[in-house]
Amino acid sequence: QPSDERWMIDGIGTDSPKLVKSAGRNGSASKLESWAEAINRVTAASLLDETRQKVRDTFAAFLGPALESRIPFAATYGNHDFQCGILADEQDDLYREFAGCMNPVADSSPLALEPGTFALPIEASDGSGRITMSVMMVNSGDYADTADAGDGNGRQSVTEYAKYAANSRGWDLADSDGYGTPSPEAVEWLKRVQRELGRRNGDGQAVPAIAFQHIPPQEFYDCLREVPAYTPNAVEGAREFAGHCYVLDRDVCRPGSRLGEAIGCADVNVGEVDALREAGGYFALFCGHDHKNSFVGHVHDIDLGYAPTCGFECYGPKSRFRGIRLFEFREDNPMAYVTRMLTWGDLVGRYSSNELRVFFEDHCVTDLIGVRNELRRPQVSATLLGAGAVTCGAIGYAVRGLLRKSQ
């Protein structure tokens, strides 16, 4: 039987069509395929251009207050950023279109490793040029998938890009091997950059530094205390920590700390906190990711802390607990920093304009762990018990009425 690759029908529509051997690709088919490919390229390019503009508009919206006040800003990346179809390296370029962006070009200096991983040294106010402290931004990755890792410079591999582009909005925790981690290069860079800052100061000493990233490392669980499953307000751990229930360890956490959900860390520990301790100088690591958490604990000789969600377009705590975290540093002793939450409740009021939505966001559950966590909340359990009692009473009353009628 002839192969479709080498044979074609000649004379279609005539009295004597025949099968002939093709010397190459069918000219009409090739033209049709070329036309289709060109259309696809144009469509994909236009869609990406539209997406880029949407990303620009989004950046402009949340950067608005900083831009209007001419306040410099820097950004790193979380596990959902890529799901718009524009990856971190290109988002970095888009950020730099805005005045005041301090994100450096990846690999442009020893202080800039990759998109979202870089150092921002702060010099003394006396004009000496001495670095008094540094802010470190760390790209903590998105989802674990070692087979499709990037090239270590923040430039995603072709395979990874294809997977993201094919179904970027669908790629999530359920499709991966857990949450991501900083790259091995980033963990090593956290040590190396301290040596570079010490070299620039001329004394070789690590400078006081605070790090910011999205996904927390496993050591954040060390700020918690394991308790029995029936403990009120306890939360069950996630993934590798599932089956264990926790509350805040008040002995290590600052006053005002809140634990609203499980710590969503990676399944593996890549030694980031150990690297911070080994490098010296690092006094704090703050993360986001878990929308309901806003605690600060001191373990492993370093502060580990959270800021919760500040908006109302996703799940989170009650309106009054949503907000941003403010930091204040003293030049003479940056390690003695002050941090506090600026919440919606403090700045605006107890309630938002859509409390029904906030209620569902606060109580949304997606699995059995979420159900169990909700049942540990005293208000929820009391409401369910009350509703159950009323229901049982109503059923009992109805049954009693039926029995009376039957007598």
Regions found by a protein language model. Name each.
Residues 379-403:
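Hydrophobic alpha-helical topogenic segments used for membrane insertion/localization
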Residues 1, 37, 41, 72-77, ...:
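Structural recognition of the beta-strand scaffold that forms the well-ordered cores
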Residues 119-127, 257-279, 291-378:
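Binuclear metal-dependent phosphoesterase catalytic core
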Residues 2-5, 44-46, 75-87, 143-146, ...:
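Active-site environment of divalent metal-dependent phosphoester hydrolases
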Residues 85-90, 148-150, 221-226, 318, ...:
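Short aromatic-enriched loop/helix-cap "lid" or pocket-rim segments at secondary-structure transitions
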Residues 134-136, 151-288:
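His/acidic metal-ligating clusters that form di-metal
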